[in-house]
Regions:
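Conserved N-terminal helical subregion
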Residues: 1-5, 20-22, 48-160, 164-177, ...
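Conserved mid-domain beta->alpha element of the FAD-binding
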Residues: 7-27, 31, 146-147, 174, ...
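Flavin-binding catalytic cores
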Residues: 226-260, 318-319, 327
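C-terminal helical "tail/cap" subdomain of flavin- and related membrane-associated enzymes
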Residues: 1-3, 66, 81, 252-255, ...
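Conserved N-terminal glycine-rich FAD pyrophosphate-binding loop of Rossmann-like flavoproteins
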Residues: 36-54
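Conserved Rossmann-like nucleotide-cofactor binding loop
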Residues: 13, 36, 152
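Active-site substrate-recognition segment that forms the wall
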Residues: 188-224, 243
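Short helix-loop capping/hinge motifs at secondary-structure junctions, enriched
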Residues: 180-186, 249, 314-315
Length: 390
């Protein structure tokens, strides 16, 4: 009999997992907490080459090729405008909301049902599977449940009520899309600038718009209501002050941005002790959220989806399939999380740390390129036809 999966979360991991399971011969339904079109996600993200190759296994690479822009080059400068490093690695940068919508639409086209306004409140094992309960009073039953419900995963709390909280990494995020500004550079390059008091990144879209983000340091984790109370103009004023005196187009780009995005805290999960239990399993940020500084969050979610599909295809016992999935994924994703933390720590090092960073980073990056030291991250490939052992 064909298995049926209940997938909680309709971001990236959820729809991709549904399509991976479908290819593996497993039916699924996706349950998204927010109403249709209510995601309102204005930020952008980057899919690294390993994530793009994982999408290719599900015939989704053409889908993302129609969104955003290629960003295969990275240039890093300091607050004086000195070039510290240049690296190259295939990647594609796209708006998060566009990717969400494209993946959902494609999942539906392939026969996956997506339900909106379905916030998970509880789940429990039944004689033959699992039952999910939602805030609107509705219920659903399946053979297994996949928690693709992100950083604040309800599924994670159900699997392990004692699961640790996400770790705040000392950085805030904001950004936007600037219009009518002639920023130095060319399309296809991610420009990263270590300002004296704030990190900044920008990309030039082929149509001229400048996509940017900033990471103001904050030792204090700000409550959501406090962040929500900061107006776009207050963010603008704060950022203009943070970048005053730094070399680079930061202030011009910020001034040319009609709507600065609401700020948010940056978190990661160094280790989530339990990934599965009672016919439930975690994927993506629910299992191993990494800070944006890794550049790998979306790619890890896609890889998870494909590997879980293989495990459930090849290992008939659900619990053993979940164990195989964790065995294949945990070491890699936790290494990525650690790399993201190291990258983020360099964004707010203080004056002494900045001096050392500017001295050492060019040497380190040359060695990274020479030795291909990040091959473990970017050269990872999944073979769909390779069987998974229990």
């Amino acid at each position: 009999m064909t298995k049926k999966a209940l997938i909680i979360g309709g971001g990236i991991a959820g729809p991709v997992t549904a399509m991976a399971l479908r290819r593996a011969g497993i039916d699924s339904e996706v349950f998204e907490a927010y109403d249709r079109g209510a995601e309102g996600v204005g930020a952008f993200l980057t899919l690294a080459v390993n994530g793009l190759e994982a999408l290719r296994l599900l015939d989704l690479h053409d889908l993302v090729r129609d969104l955003g822009m290629d960003t295969p080059v990275m240039e890093i400068r300091n607050a004086r405008g000195r070039l510290l490093a240049t690296t190259s690695q295939p990647s594609r940068t796209l708006r998060r909301a566009d990717l969400y919508q494209a993946l959902r639409d494609e999942a539906v086209r392939r026969g996956v049902r997506i339900h909106y306004g379905k916030r998970l409140t509880g789940a429990s094992a039944t004689a033959n599977g699992v039952r999910a309960v939602f805030a609107d009073g509705g219920e659903a039953e399946g053979d297994l449940l996949v928690g693709a419900d992100g950083l604040r995963s309800r599924t994670r709390a159900l699997i392990d009520p004692g699961a640790p909280r996400a770790r705040y990494v000392g950085l805030l995020n904001t950004g936007g899309y600037a219009e009518g500004v002639r920023a130095p550079g060319r399309p296809g390059v991610c420009y990263f600038i270590f300002g004296r008091r704030c990190f900044f990144g920008y990309m030039i879209h082929p149509e001229g718009q400048v996509w940017w983000f900033a990471n103001p340091p904050s030792r204090r984790e700000m409550p959501p209501e406090e962040l929500a109370a900061i107006t776009p103009e207050q963010w603008r004023a704060r950022l203009m002050d943070l970048f005053e005196g730094d070399a680079g187009p930061m202030r011009e780009i910020i001034a040319a941005t009609p709507d600065i995005l609401p700020g948010w805290n940056t978190y990661d999960f160094p280790r989530v002790p339990k990934w599965s239990g009672e016919r439930m399993v975690l994927v993506g940020d629910a299992a191993h959220a990494t800070s944006p500084s890794s550049g790998q969050g979306a790619s890890m979610a896609v890889e998870d989806a494909v590997v879980l599909g293989k495990c459930l295809r090849d290992v008939p016992d659900t619990a053993k399939a979940f164990a195989a999935f964790e065995r294949l994924r945990r070491e890699r994703v936790e290494r990525v999380v650690a790399q993201g933390k190291r990258n983020g720590d360099g964004k707010a090092p203080g004056a002494g740390g900045a001096f050392v960073r500017d001295l050492i980073l060019p040497v380190v990056m040359r060695q990274v390129e020479k030795r291909n030291a990040l091959a473990w991250m970017h050269d990872y490939r999944i073979t769909w036809d390779e069987r998974v052992a229990a």
